[in-house]
Structures are given as structure tokens and as C-alpha cells.
């Protein structure tokens, strides 16, 4: 059922990097999540970021406006996704 998930990405107009992402999922009762990237770092030329993970209790028609709800502080912070002890090993 994951194949039905819908994803949205917001790219920074100056850096062309994704600042936010949102997704609507249907498994286990479904829901909407909104993630905000922070703590950008590069290791071995690969970009890594952490995320603030928000829950959005919205109607289906509001999904495409989830960023507006974030900007108005209308989303609930569920967790932080923080990458630790990252290592990048070159392959041959």
C-alpha cells in the first residue's frame, strides 16, 4: 500500500536544495507528516541533514497547503530525526 503515498518537496530558490518535505501515507490508519531540514553537513561529498518531524491533522484538500500550516505554527512536533555517527567509505 506504500505505493499510494504522496510526496511534496519544497526547494530553496537560491541553493536548489530541499528545505521541506511532506508526505501523505495510508498504512496503519494513514496521516500526513511534514519535515523541516536542519543541521546540514557534508561527508565525503554527500549531503546529510537532520529533520524536525511534524504531524499534520488536515483534511485531504489541505495537504497541498501544509507549508502554510507550518508557517502559522499549526503543526505538532512529533520527533526529531538526528543522524549520528555517520561514516562514508569510498568504494573501489
Regions found by a protein language model. Name each.
Residues 1-86:
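Gly/Pro-enriched, hydrophobic low-complexity segments
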Residues 91-92:
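Short, solvent-exposed mixed-charge patches
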Amino acid at each position: 500500500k506504500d505505493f499510494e503515498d504522496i510526496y511534496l518537496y519544497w526547494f530553496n530558490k537560491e541553493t536548489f536544495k530541499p528545505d521541506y518535505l511532506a508526505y501523505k501515507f495510508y498504512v496503519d490508519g494513514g496521516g500526513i507528516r511534514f519535515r523541516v531540514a536542519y543541521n546540514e553537513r557534508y561527508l565525503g561529498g554527500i549531503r546529510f541533514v537532520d529533520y524536525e518531524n511534524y504531524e499534520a491533522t488536515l483534511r485531504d484538500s489541505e495537504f497541498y497547503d501544509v507549508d502554510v500550516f507550518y508557517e502559522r505554527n499549526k503543526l505538532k512536533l512529533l520527533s526529531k530525526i538526528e543522524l549520528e555517527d555517520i561514516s562514508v567509505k569510498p568504494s573501489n
